[in-house]
């Protein structure tokens, strides 16, 4: 959300170029497959790929360009209403459902400022993860790394809610994410 704020404040433009460097590349996502070191890619593509495909290369470029991991994470705390522990700053991308729900509640409260982000979340695997068994569309950001499959999202239909499902169940976790969202949806509605 930091980059979307910078765009909204006029400090950045979606067309701004970023140079991909060798140390940015991580497996998974389209950037790793279709671009190489030295290629130039615009901010819009980086943001879209990071959200829609959970592209780690795009995320790496963005947090490095923001001032590095620690600066990026420190500034991201502005969206949290709860304290985080020291693990939050470790490079393993440690997250808790409390922190991710804080992000989602903030996003819900300021939806008009994050239309582009919500659009990308709507296009993130619309039939998988939180959306796998849902009667409504969930605006989601998913991720998977080793045995960790996770997804966070907003359901804006009927009775809106935020949901964060973080698993360590391998590929089984991906299936359970959608089932949990469906159960929550049935309970709320």
Give residue ranges: language-model regions.
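Active-site-proximal beta-strand/loop segments in catalytic clefts of secreted hydrolases
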Residues: 21-23, 50-54, 62-66, 141-144, ...
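Short glycine/serine- and small hydrophobic-enriched flexible loop segments
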Residues: 1-9, 64, 102-109, 182-186
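Active-site-adjacent helix/loop patches that line small-molecule binding or acyl-intermediate pockets
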Residues: 26, 34-116
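Acidic helix-start/capping segments at beta-turn-to-alpha-helix junctions
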Residues: 15-32, 67
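Structured C-terminal helix/loop/strand segments within mature extracytoplasmic catalytic/sensor domains
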Residues: 92, 108-126, 141-189
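Short alpha-helical "patches" and their helix-cap loops
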Residues: 14-22, 73-77, 113-123
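Active-site SXXK
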Residues: 1-18, 50, 163
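Active-site-adjacent substrate-binding region
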Residues: 123-137
């Amino acid at each position: 959300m930091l980059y979307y704020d910078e765009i909204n404040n006029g400090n950045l433009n979606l067309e701004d170029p970023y140079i991909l460097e060798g140390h940015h590349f991580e497996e998974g996502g389209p950037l790793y497959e279709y671009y190489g070191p030295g290629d130039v890619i615009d901010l819009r593509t980086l943001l879209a790929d990071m959200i829609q495909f959970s592209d780690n290369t795009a995320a790496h470029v963005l947090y490095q360009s923001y001032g590095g991991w620690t600066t990026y994470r420190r500034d991201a705390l502005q969206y949290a209403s709860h304290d985080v522990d020291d693990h939050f700053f470790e490079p393993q991308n440690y997250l808790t459902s409390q922190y991710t729900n804080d992000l989602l509640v903030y996003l819900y409260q300021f939806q008009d400022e994050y239309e582009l982000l919500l659009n990308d979340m709507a296009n993130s695997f619309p039939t998988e993860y939180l959306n796998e068994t849902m009667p409504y569309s969930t605006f989601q950001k998913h991720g998977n790394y080793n045995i960790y499959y996770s997804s966070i999202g907003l359901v804006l239909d009927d009775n809106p809610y935020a949901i964060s499902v973080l698993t360590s169940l391998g590929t089984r976790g991906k299936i359970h994410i959608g089932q949990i969202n469906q159960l929550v949806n049935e309970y709320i509605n």
